[in-house]
UniProtKB/Swiss-Prot annotation:
Molecular functions (GO terms): acetyl-CoA C-acetyltransferase activity
Sequence similarity: Belongs to the thiolase-like superfamily. Thiolase family.
Name assigned to this protein: Acetyl-CoA acetyltransferase
Keyword list, A-Z: Acyltransferase, Cytoplasm, Fatty acid metabolism, Lipid metabolism, Transferase
Active site positions: C88 (acyl-thioester intermediate), H349 (proton acceptor), C379 (proton acceptor)
Reactions performed catalytically: 2 acetyl-CoA = acetoacetyl-CoA + CoA
EC assignment: 2.3.1.9
Any one GO cellular component localisation term in the record: cytoplasm
Length: 393
């Protein structure tokens, strides 16, 4: 079976909600990382066989946002593109689909990744407007909440699924806040030290006062304290434990990687960062969707023929502190090797991009720490999880 190698991995900075990147569409963010990933891979765009990009909040973006991003990035019109939606797992599923395409022999080089601008998610009128409204009020529907952050099976916010896990596992408010503080501290230190600079492509943003360059993550809060977190009110249940401080953010950003068959990489003289060892998805009850990484990781480890102890570094998406801690309990995650520079609670969670983003960060962390095996994993709204294991070369 043909090995699949990764020859470049890049992301934009992550912007805060209505922040520095809010005026840059998901399509434009996607185009920026696609173009930069190709540049860093040192290949001609004409050699690309397909572009696959995750994107969740597609309402109003137009047909096939991945196709739009590819064309804006300068990809030739003859090269096809696919947009996929697996909620928070979209960006990592795009990598798995690209790998499958190469393994099957359908492609040699695939651009994969994810893109999201949650700040630009539109509001919708009810569909009955098409039949005519004779009287009464109309309610606008927030596509960000409805299509991105609401459990379609149980009709409640993702935050309630985090509360469910906290109750099921007896995870205290203090434990959640302690994880949030860890994430903020590590991420803020990493930003200050420029740890993420090598994985980030700066974004030029046009403003009324002229062009500005956004080159660092906007969301981490260096002034976060335990006392400040403790003062925050529960966000989803009156007597709950999940707050805005121990949950991930609402954010904008994109990430992309170039996948190449090992034989093609050798033929072109490309330097591979890593090879994909395995990937897997799993399902859990939608009411505790945050536990999805558990079966997904167990399956991925089995496919790779290794144990979790063999993994050197882990990037586990922090959708919610309680969710992360529940997964940590079930998998017995070693915190010394997990989210070593913070996670989504501090960095942010642009949902369609996050799967690719954590893989990009994982790859650069493996290089930084001179480690070999890495695991990337995310929970997925609706009750799923996705995991991928890579081996640095």
């Amino acid at each position: 079976m043909e090995n699949v190698v990764i020859v470049s991995a890049v992301r934009t900075p992550i912007g805060s909600f209505n922040g520095a990147l809010s005026s840059v569409s998901a399509v434009d963010l996607g185009a920026i990382v696609i173009q930069e990933a190709i540049k860093r891979a040192n290949i001609e765009s004409a050699l690309v066989n397909e572009v696959i990009m995750g994107n969740v909040l597609q309402a109003g973006l137009g047909q096939n946002p991945a196709r739009q991003a590819a064309l804006k990035a300068g990809i030739e019109k003859e090269i096809p593109s696919l947009t996929i939606n697996k909620v928070c797992g979209s960006g990592l599923k795009s990598v798995a689909l690209g790998a499958q395409s190469i393994i099957s022999g359908d492609a040699d080089i695939v651009v994969v990744g994810g893109m999201e601008n949650m700040s630009q998610a539109p509001y919708l009128l009810d569909s009955k407007v098409r039949q005519g409204v004779k009287m009464g009020n109309l309610t606008l529907r927030d596509t960000m909440i409805e299509d991105g952050l609401t459990c379609a099976s149980n009709h409640y916010h993702m935050g309630i699924t985090a509360e469910n896990i906290a109750e099921q596992y007896g995870i205290s408010r203090q434990a959640q806040d302690e994880l949030a503080l860890r994430s903020q501290t590590l991420a803020s230190q990493a930003v200050q030290l420029g740890v993420f600079d090598k994985e980030i492509v700066p974004v030029m943003v046009k403003t009324r006062k002229g062009d500005i360059i956004v080159s660092r993550d906007e969301y981490p809060k260096a002034d976060t304290t335990a006392e400040g977190l403790a003062k925050l009110k529960p966000a989803f249940k009156k007597e709950g434990t999940v707050t805005a401080g121990n949950a991930s953010g609402i954010n904008d950003g994109a990430a992309a990687l170039i996948l190449v068959s090992e034989s093609k990489a050798h033929a072109l003289g490309l330097k591979a960062i890593a090879k994909i060892r395995s990937y897997a998805s799993g399902g859990v009850d939608p009411s505790v969707m945050g536990l999805g990484p558990v079966p997904a990781t167990q399956k991925a480890l089995k496919k790779a023929g290794i144990n979790l102890d063999d993994i050197d570094l882990i990037e586990a998406n922090e959708a919610f502190a309680s969710q992360f801690l529940g997964v940590g309990k079930d998998l017995n995650l070693d915190m010394n090797k997990t989210n070593i520079h913070g996670g989504a609670i501090a960095l942010g969670h642009p949902i369609g991009a996050s799967g690719a983003r954590i893989l990009v960060t994982l790859l650069h962390n493996l290089i930084e720490k001179d480690k070999k095996l890495g695991l990337a994993t995310l929970c997925i709204g609706g009750g799923q999880g996705i995991s991928m294991i890579v081996e640095r070369l």
